Design a protein with these regions (language model features):
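Loop-helix junctions at membrane interfaces
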Residues: 1-212
Length: 212
């Protein structure tokens, strides 16, 4: 004889922990630590200026893709801040490095154009155009650099800005999520190019105004 249980059916629900804009805070802390640790690893050395580019700069976009714009920017910023404190030889102006990291994470997180933040790319693009204008304008109008030389000298920054502003940012996000390994590789290359270019632009404009 079987007896059916009576009473209200119970359901087990997993409680979410603390989050930053939907991203678990543990992820934010972990990836910020990764960025900080990679500050010790040189990616390239600039002999003329006596400084090096740390490998942490290569993962700024990756953090934004994983965590999203807000949490990604926070993790990159905190990681970069800790990085310049423990590896000061990798920066010229700490504030510039941190600002560049924050903007790279924010831009990378805004690439897919989905969700309630699908429109964030627009004000961010306007801000980046202003930053680029200040950067190139300082060279042309204050320091007398030929406009074509200023554009060629900032070609990485300008191309990254165009790739972000144009619908190519959506294409890059689609390729990153593709099951095709070749498309993923192209998306990773272009996405890293965009993030690195935006990071450099936002950091360089501060450095350029301070020293020029």
């Amino acid at each position: 004889m079987s007896i059916k249980p009576t009473g209200e059916e119970r359901a087990i629900k997993r409680r979410a922990g603390a989050t930053v804009d939907g991203a678990p805070i543990s992820y934010v802390i972990a990836l910020a630590a990764v960025v900080a640790v990679l500050s010790f690893v040189p990616l390239s050395i600039v002999i003329g200026s006596g400084k090096s580019f740390p490998m942490s700069q290569a993962v700024y976009p990756l953090v934004g893709w994983i965590l999203g714009p807000v949490a990604g920017a926070l993790a990159d910023g905190v990681g970069a801040l800790v990085g310049v404190l423990i590896a000061p030889h990798t920066t010229t102006i700490p504030a510039a490095t941190v600002f560049g990291a924050v903007m790279a994470g924010l831009a990378a997180g805004c690439m897919n154009g989905e969700g309630r933040r699908g429109w964030w790319w627009l004000p961010l693009s306007i801000l980046l155009f202003v930053v680029y204008g200040l950067y190139v304008g300082r060279a042309v109008f204050r320091n007398g650099v030929a406009w074509w030389a200023a554009l060629l000298g900032s070609i990485i920054d300008g191309s990254a800005l165009l790739l972000f502003v144009l619908p190519t940012r959506l294409l890059i996000a689609r390729w990153l999520a593709s099951e095709n390994a070749g498309l993923r590789a192209v998306g990773l290359f272009l996405g890293t190019w965009v993030g690195a270019g935006i990071s450099h632009l936002c950091a360089a404009v501060i450095v350029y105004y301070v020293f020029n």
